[in-house]
């Protein structure tokens, strides 16, 4: 790993509730901080999960073209095609399946409140707009706790729900994917 003797490591925190695009500015500031501290003209980025999407979005952004300050980009566990569990949360404020087990009681209460208050969906989308950036960009199959990468509609002979038929689309990741040749 990195040590002071053989390299420079800087952790970059981001607000996971903010849209990916909003986190790019924070990443750029940290890159500038590292370049100023080390004298390097380029940095290596390693991003996990949504952090990988933030790093990728930066490298594919117009702002990056003028800077060209990333030598290598590595993403680990980043949902480049979206995340199946984001869809029920964004579409219906359903949180049970998306939370760790220790929060299931809270999620049950949340789901009860969501059924009683239609404004809860508006509130969720306002408080955590990043969920929209994580919506699936392909057909998904979700069998409860057994997520296989596809949304699944078991009411129609076990047919997949095509991404095109989902009420909400993820234009952000789709557009990012269209620019993948810039990587």
Regions found by a protein language model. Name each.
Residues 42-47, 76:
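Short beta-strand immediately N-terminal to the catalytic nucleophile in serine-hydrolase-like folds
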Residues 1-41:
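Active-site catalytic motif of lipid deacylating hydrolases and related acyltransferases
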Residues 20, 54-55, 82-85:
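Extracytoplasmic/secreted cell-surface and envelope-processing proteins
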Residues 25-28, 56-60:
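Short, hydrophobic alpha-helix immediately C-terminal to the catalytic nucleophile
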Residues 46-47, 51, 55:
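Gly/Ala-rich beta-loop-alpha elbow adjacent to hydrolase catalytic centers
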Residues 60-183:
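Helical cap/lid subdomain of alpha/beta-hydrolase-fold lipid enzymes
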